[in-house]
Amino acid sequence: MNRTLTRRRFVAGAAGMAVTVALPRTAAARRRRRRRTADVCIVGAGLAGLTAARNIVRSGRDVIVLEARDRVGGRTRNAQVGPGVVTELGAEFVGPTQDRILALARAVGVDTFPTYNAGSNVLIVDGQRTLYPAATGFSEQSAFVDAVSVIPALDAMAAQVGVTAPWKAPRASEWDAMTLGQFRDANIPSTGGRALFDAAVRGIWGAEASELSLLFALFYVAAAGNPQTPGSFVRLFSTPNAAQESRFVRGSQEVAIQVARRLGSRVVLESPVRRIESGSDTVTVVADHDEVRARRVIVAVPPVLANRIGYSPALPRTKARLLRRIVPGNLLKWEAVYERPFWRDAGLSGQGVTDQGPAQVPFDNSPPQGAPGILFSFVGGDFARAAQRQSTAEHQATFAENMAAFFGDEARNMTGYLEGNWTTDPWTRGCPVGHTGRNVLATLGPQLRKPVGTIHFAGTETADYWFGYMDGAVRSGERAAREVLRSL
């Protein structure tokens, strides 16, 4: 692997994200670029790009993967918190029906272990703290009941939305003209129920319900399954038999690390792509340090970044409009490290939900051996935007108070604190997923996965099933690889 890509280099960058600026494209700079050729060039070494590369190489074709960062993994990123102990600052959970990421992990020797889910979850509404069983994930408290009362309706509507073409749903235009927030207000009677629903929305999308098209949200629900299993809203926010059921041993980034290791020198780090020049049967991909001539290119980066690449000729107007209107989420991860998972002593799972912010949905993120203890929570939507104006020290103090409300005073006794802030990462610019507001998906959606000549597109925002998740990224890479191989 290029640029002395040891395993240490792959994991590098976990403590922070470097700010990078565009470099001037002088003649001298062009002369210094390494000129390469391949059947396929792939932009981005996240799970989508690496999966596409793996499948294309296995079919006997040449590939070069250009990655802007000094590591692989995209929106998966490990951070070491002790000898042999990692936590994840990005995507981490996997669960039933996420078949493709689980198959890829097995193929490269990465095992899973169950998310800690024993004992009771904590619910806080109007300052009142109650417990409910982690095994079911449901409380009989009135606000909680109100919040989940809309799930049957959401699931029924989502069943009418096809994952391959949600814009063809019978009521696509009607639903795309509404927001999820409008649906919430019309169907959840209590203030507390709406607040708990919003907490789930922020954790799932990193956005406010008012920012999401109802059609987009229904597509997302429909996508939380596989061809044999219909999607459901419960599968998005629950732990047992749902999206948060399991984690990867050695951290989620380990999957990308192992795939990249097998690709070897085909993966080139610290090579941000600036321009793609496409012809009828060839394409030239221009990066800061490399220039690749290929027969096809796969752009496997978030839409907000794909839109920042220069294209010659320009992308079709509708494709460019869609890339501009897929808005990255605002989601932070705040993580506290403790000597041990003390909450387990009190029979608590480390999970919960509150109507107050900013840290509304905690999880036990401890390693398989149980120590050190780690708690994390998502901070999403408006709470994440407000947090961007605060210091890390303020985040830590706020997080300590939030966790103490859930799990008692011992939560203030942190031995370490970490956070994942993807909005400030120039090569992501938001997390966990891009979303669309009103009147986008029904009109521009057909452009989502559509190739443009020799340019193909991958990434979790182009997935059918598990759009927004690691599984969706893998599925999109597999689909893009199939497209390219058919064209060669």
Task: List the model feature ranges, each with a label.
Residues 1-17:
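N-terminal secretory signal peptides and thylakoid transit peptides that target proteins
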Residues 40-64:
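N-terminal Rossmann-like FAD-binding beta1-loop-alpha1 element of flavoenzymes
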Residues 57-78:
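Glycine-rich FAD pyrophosphate-binding loop
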Residues 59, 133-134, 282, 300, ...:
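Conserved flavin/dinucleotide-binding core of flavoenzymes
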Residues 71-92:
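Conserved N-terminal glycine-rich FAD pyrophosphate-binding loop of Rossmann-like flavoproteins
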Residues 85-156:
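Dinucleotide-binding Rossmann-like beta1-alpha1 core, especially the glycine-rich loop
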Residues 162-271, 280-282, 300, 310, ...:
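Active-site/ligand-binding neighborhood in enzyme catalytic cores
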Residues 278, 287-345:
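Central helical "cap/lid" subdomain
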